[in-house]
Swiss-Prot record:
Mg(2+) binds at E25, D27, D85. It comes from Loxosceles amazonica (Recluse spider). CDD domains: GDPD_like_SMaseD_PLD. Dermonecrotic toxins cleave the phosphodiester linkage between the phosphate and headgroup of certain phospholipids (sphingolipid and lysolipid substrates), forming an alcohol (often choline) and a cyclic phosphate. This toxin acts on sphingomyelin (SM). It may also act on ceramide phosphoethanolamine (CPE), lysophosphatidylcholine (LPC) and lysophosphatidylethanolamine (LPE), but not on lysophosphatidylserine (LPS), and lysophosphatidylglycerol (LPG). It acts by transphosphatidylation, releasing exclusively cyclic phosphate products as second products. One of its GO terms (cellular component) is extracellular region. It is found in: Secreted. This is Dermonecrotic toxin LamSicTox-alphaIV1i. Expressed by the venom gland.
Amino acid sequence: WIMGHMVNEIYQIDEFVDLGANSIETDITFDDDAMAEYSYHGVPCDCMRWCHKWEYVNDFLEGLRRATTPGDSKYRKQLILVVFDLKTGDLSSSTAYKGGKLFAEKLLRYYWNGGSNGGRAYIIISIPDIDHYAFISGFRDALKKSGHEDLLAKVGYDFSGNDDLNSIRSALHKAGVKDREHVWQSGGITNCLLRSLDRVNEAVKNRDSSNGYISKMYYWTIEKYATGRDALNAEVDGIMTNYPDVIVNVLNEDSFKNRFRMATFDDNPWELFKR
């Protein structure tokens, strides 16, 4: 999965898919009542990126729905996975549940179209703070109570704060998520800084172990050819990048073209890939 980073305006969906992304990451901010308000990152953000692009969440979700609904004039077949980077910093552990409930209701209305012919992309809800695990509980409960528990088949989970893996596993369990139940694990740092592959290697080892909790592992934010090669050699499942075309080119190199391919809609993002 090539994951286009910081896609916060509707026009950027086409921009990143045109560059080769089959997945995008979108930042979501919340108001004082725990309601998702904007697709917006703000400062600081990655080097060489404009941090202030935004849409109202409802508008972005409708644009995203069109881009991922077969038959729509805006449909982009390649776009199969969306990561919502949830900026929950202004939520408390007590309001996180409410935030998850309200976000699920918003997705149900504006993205899944009330459960009728909505967007088909798989969704990852990515939370930076393991203390906000109740966001996941609220999200799951809202879909169950609305009679749309079936949509949870399209939803995965990630804690993105680079916490200790055992602590993340514990937070997932508290949220009601079992080991390998649609669990993506991120690892990385802003492109402005350097980071070793230690975190990636630890997560990949967990993913591939008989008693791990991780289904897929992705690395962020990659810019350079050399770093892309290192990530693929570490056998990650996804790469988040500001330059999808760079990763496409790396995948086409002799060293990788017979080992990896781009994921399609027929590839289940929750299944552990046996290497």
